[in-house]
Amino acid sequence: MTVVPGDHLLEPEAAGGGGGDPPQGGCVSGGGCDRYEPLPPALPAAGEQDCCGERVVINISGLRFETQLKTLCQFPETLLGDPKRRMRYFDPLRNEYFFDRNRPSFDAILYYYQSGGRIRRPVNVPIDIFSEEIRFYQLGEEAMEKFREDEGFLREEERPLPRRDFQRQVWLLFEYPESSGPARGIAIVSVLVILISIVIFCLETLPEFRDEKDYPASPSQDVFEAANNSTSGASSGASSFSDPFFVVETLCIIWFSFELLVRFFACPSKATFSRNIMNLIDIVAIIPYFITLGTELAERQGNGQQAMSLAILRVIRLVRVFRIFKLSRHSKGLQILGQTLKASMRELGLLIFFLFIGVILFSSAVYFAEADDPSSGFNSIPDAFWWAVVTMTTVGYGDMHPVTIGGKIVGSLCAIAGVLTIALPVPVIVSNFNYFYHRETEGEEQAQYMHVGSCQHLSSSAEELRKARSNSTLSKSEYMVIEEGGMNHSAFPQTPFKTGNSTATCTTNNNPNSCVNIKKIFTDV
């Protein structure tokens, strides 16, 4: 019995011999029955055409696998489960399907069909190669999500967009610099304003620019300031608004406030926007200016009387340094670092807990070891906390050090314990960093292939992708016609746009199924 993929017609049995029902046929040649020809067997139903119990041979780079068609038909939306998709790989001479793919990976791919949807990566196959195989065989997003969860990857959060067109355009303009040229220009302006604000914050602390009333000074300067506070208070308050640093700071705050308000009114969810840590940093970055401005106005109305404690005012001014974290909105590196720290909070908590135990243990030990030496600087266990922290982190400032033999032994053990304690959670943190880094890199590579927005924007994206891929050399198996449900091929007079190793088409009707998601069909050979 021979299996012919596509038609799957069984060879007719001989007309003569055998028992059972007589063969059905018809007479040919003239009015009489000169000879008898059996009729071909009836074609199976549409749903049963390929889902029979016949066996099929799959050749993966020379390694032959054999399975039943009904096993593959469990997942008709995949490459092997759809007879039309896998037909292009059929070799009629050898009566088998040939795929020039990774051989060790196909053990897990075939097990996916045999087990009813369980995906397991072979230990000798790298994660990135197995991910490419899942995409090539089109196992679907659900299989990819299961695989990533089994490998310990974090689930990517969806980024909703506003529903209104104008609101969505404004949100993309200020939140996603890579969305368009104007958005990239706004991001550059925002980065420049942040850098100018940080430079001004540092320069105004120089002695020639420093306002002695707001920043610490030497004791003699404090006495001189107190003596002349009554005479110079009003004039200094009057000149504060004409200070160049104040003018530049005001311009920066105007931009920060404008950017924050626009993003707040254009965001898809006000509650989510208010809980975002980056937005809270934006709010904290502009609050010190308004507090300082209110203090200056209160001093002018109070004839130079101090309206706020200098210590509180200096702390408020110090909060301005958090503006540097605003750069993380425009820096992929800082975002990766923040995501790594967030994902490694448990490991960091364990590290701090271990260091806390070590500090208590070794500070107590060194205190009692140095108790008999009057020249020792370890006057109490709390005083030894600083020495224990510096020693366990292998910094070693040298301001406090043991002098006795017992103290030196304790110090040696403290340093060794610190090295071991810090080294334990480092591999996990590095693994998280590598994951976020490779995910960001993979996202940037696939961003040029992904279909973003509606169908009406596809033509321009297709033209750009054709230009980008015009010089690439592709094998015959790289271009795959992806057929989605509900698509009418007669409605596609235009040339399909090709994304590396996949082919996608899009109509201009209002059917959401007429657009093919490039992320779902992206394959690699």
From Swiss-Prot:
Looking at the UniProt entry, the stretches that span the membrane are: 185-203, 245-266, 278-298, 313-331, 348-367, 409-431
Q: Mind telling me which GO cellular component terms the entry cites?
A: axon; calyx of Held; glutamatergic synapse; membrane; membrane raft; plasma membrane; postsynaptic membrane; presynaptic membrane
Give a GO molecular function annotation for the protein. Answer: voltage-gated potassium channel activity
Q: Which UniProt keywords apply?
A: Cell membrane, Glycoprotein, Ion channel, Ion transport, Lipoprotein, Membrane, Palmitate, Phosphoprotein, Potassium, Potassium channel, Potassium transport, Transmembrane, Transmembrane helix, Transport, Voltage-gated channel
Q: Which residues carry this modification: Phosphotyrosine?
A: Y449
Is the keyword Ribonucleoprotein in the record? no
Activity regulation field: Activity is up-regulated by JAK2.
Residues the UniProt record annotates as site (Not glycosylated) = N228
- Superkingdom per UniProt: Eukaryota
Pfam families named among the record's database cross-references: BTB_2, Ion_trans
Compartments, as annotated in UniProt: Cell membrane
**Topology feature Cytoplasmic, residues:** 1-184, 267-277, 332-347, 432-525
Where does lipidation (S-palmitoyl cysteine) occur on this chain?
Answer: C267
Location (main, coarse): membrane
Q: Which residues lie on this side of the membrane: Extracellular?
A: 204-244, 299-312, 368-408
GO terms classed as biological process: action potential; corpus callosum development; optic nerve development; potassium ion transmembrane transport; potassium ion transport; protein homooligomerization
Q: Which SMART domains match?
A: BTB (SM00225)
How does the UniProt record describe the way this protein sits in the membrane?
Answer: Multi-pass membrane protein
Q: Could you give the domain comment from the record?
A: The N-terminus may be important in determining the rate of inactivation of the channel while the tail may play a role in modulation of channel activity and/or targeting of the channel to specific subcellular compartments.
| Name listed for the protein in its UniProt record | Potassium voltage-gated channel subfamily A member 3
Organism listed in the record: Rattus norvegicus (Rat)
